[in-house]
């Protein structure tokens, strides 16, 4: 199942299986070596802790890479099938061509205990470059193929995490040493061409890189700003993938495999006629939610609307129940994690006696209709085949609305402590 963001936060109490869940995602492709576990250190404070740095201790510039940068290069090598040359204004420009998407596995980078250090500091470069990813929409791709006389399945662009200017400061010896440290064999024709491409354009975020951070909220960890939350998909792990003691030995559900997104511009939904009505209803839904959040620090903007459209493109709802499930999960992953504060900060702007959480409950009850008090399809889990059955049932399991339970929990916490937040 494709997600609509490649950056995930798995929040929950210790021991729920967050790190193991991420490791399980790669079992479908065990030969790819497409999993990297990086324990975050409390003393990380700048992007060089994540991506490496330039050292001049030996008198000459030398780049010291990290396991994260090595893994990023490995993900790119899995994507790239060939490097070709184009001449633009007399200069040779290198460009890459990738394998078919079905041949490209996701590469999972697990940042364990991600908030032991201030995420806004050591993760700043990734958070900025993440917003530059661009997949061509079907109409853009058709125009591009027409102009180039090509038949590309996709075109993906992204700014570099490691800029070419940094590599240009290195002499040939230092560059060759770095290439070797990054796992590239310059005696191999394709890998040498990939390295030449990196030297010309820098090293960007590969589209198959899934970054997943495990999060515990206690006295030893740091909180998240809305800058981080807005760029991530946040999962309250035990709500999406609950620890059911009764099903420990014979689970009835299993999590779906998660894949990388292949969309970045929600306006691509206009190229999908069967999603037209759902997109209009989703805009109405988000406007209703934002009507409650206006005049508060939690008001939503274009990024939220774009990502709701991307959620429709990723899940392709077949009916109203699945559409409500997308809305419910969107509230859990994108809206409620942004909301925190005391009674004054969460005061309703509609009535003096109410609060923002109560107002949200009323809007969601209206928008979700009968599903608010009933159930909705679970988009992230599937049923396990029972003993004696050849295959699992095709219909998705049904679960209560997750945002209803979370809002009730946040309201109870606000009443008890005069402060609340999304985080368990």
Residue ranges and their predicted role:
Residues 1-424:
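C-terminal regulatory/interaction module of P-loop NTP-utilizing enzymes
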